[in-house]
Amino acid sequence: MKRREAREKALQALFQIELNEMSLDQAIKNIMEDEQDDYMEKLVEGVMANKAEIDAIIEPNLDNWRMDRLSKVDLSLLRLSVYEINYLDDVPNRVSLNESIEIAKIYSDEKSSKFINGVLANIAPEDK
């Protein structure tokens, strides 16, 4: 599975966890069916293990927004991206940012992709 697909599947799992208060294992199982992808699982597990810290990074960068006003898709995608940016050294920040914008265009809308771009641009140093 390519990393883009792993990110999309991770977003879907995080969305299920957020929306349905589903367990991490059940969400991964629902999304992956009989497949397995280590990177996808690493993303979901990493976001959930560091959720409070990730939210603390996101919240001050929302510019007149509150986290409880964000759509579940946008919030899940921001968490996923912040995890990649701050916790994984093998993904350049620019790649994570661009992937998030493209995934937002698929699962959310143009307005959300611009919003996500703005939030992540404040969070992600460009030199990694």
UniProtKB/Swiss-Prot annotation:
CDD domains from the UniProt entry: Terminator_NusB
Protein keywords: RNA-binding, Transcription, Transcription antitermination, Transcription regulation
Domain of life from the UniProt record: Bacteria
A GO cellular-component term linked to this record: cytosol
Signal peptide (from-to): none
InterPro entries attached to this UniProt entry: NusB-like_sf (IPR035926), NusB_fam (IPR011605), NusB_RsmB_TIM44 (IPR006027)
UniProt-recorded Gene Ontology molecular function terms: RNA binding
A Gene Ontology BP annotation from the UniProt entry: transcription antitermination
NCBIfam families in UniProt: nusB, PRK00202.1-1
Role: Involved in transcription antitermination. Required for transcription of ribosomal RNA (rRNA) genes. Binds specifically to the boxA antiterminator sequence of the ribosomal RNA (rrn) operons.
Homology family: Belongs to the NusB family.
Listed name of the protein: Transcription antitermination protein NusB
Source species: Listeria welshimeri serovar 6b (strain ATCC 35897 / DSM 20650 / CCUG 15529 / CIP 8149 / NCTC 11857 / SLCC 5334 / V8)
GN (gene name): nusB
